[in-house]
Amino acid sequence: MDNLNINFINDDEHPIPSQDLLLKCLQLVADKHHISHAEVNLNIVSNDEIQQINKQFRNKDKPTNIISFEFEKPQGLPDDIANDFLGDIVIAPAVLENEAKEQNKELNDHWQHIFIHGLLHLLGYDHQGDQEAEVMENLEIQLLAQLGIANPYIEQEDQNGR
């Protein structure tokens, strides 16, 4: 795992899961995509900060759980520089906490799901169309199952047989 790195940027010390838990998610995604070296910035921000970012980059004036920015290597940058850098992920822990409560999910499970979701965006996956969404969701379900986490797209009542 020495070749996989998450740069945690959490200036306000928002509560987050263990770094090992999130590194395990990166390892799963990297293994699935035959990536041996990867680096990601994980920015932990407040609801206000993510709302500003969401408004600026997505024209949506509301907080969201995650925003991913895939790295695009500038022209002229030598191939051996920044090859491993996938991009930046911005997460608002308070949004994740509220979603986990509303959806009756374990908070760490939800964190892992959303972080994997963001990593897949950095690798070019999207969910704009139904077909793209199905591919991305199926991959998320498969990766989460390897972590022992239930399908996040099934209502909690359905998972409990109610």
UniProtKB/Swiss-Prot annotation:
Cofactor note: Binds 1 zinc ion.
One Pfam family of this chain: YbeY
Cofactor list: Zn(2+)
PROSITE patterns from the UniProt entry: UPF0054
Major location category of this protein: cytoplasm
Extent of the signal sequence: none
Positions of Zn(2+) binding: 117, 121, 127
EC number: 3.1.-.-
Keywords for the protein's UniProt record, in alphabetical order: Cytoplasm, Endonuclease, Hydrolase, Metal-binding, Nuclease, Ribosome biogenesis, rRNA processing, Zinc
Keyword ATP-binding attributed: no
EC class of the enzyme, as a word: hydrolase
GO cellular component: cytoplasm
Gene Ontology terms for molecular function: metalloendopeptidase activity; RNA endonuclease activity; zinc ion binding
Subcellular locations according to the entry: Cytoplasm
Keyword Nucleotide-binding: no
GO biological process: rRNA processing
Family to which this protein belongs: Belongs to the endoribonuclease YbeY family.
Function per UniProt: Single strand-specific metallo-endoribonuclease involved in late-stage 70S ribosome quality control and in maturation of the 3' terminus of the 16S rRNA.
Alphabetized HAMAP family for the sequence: Endoribonucl_YbeY
Record-given protein name: Endoribonuclease YbeY
Lineage: Bacteria, Pseudomonadati, Pseudomonadota, Gammaproteobacteria, Thiotrichales
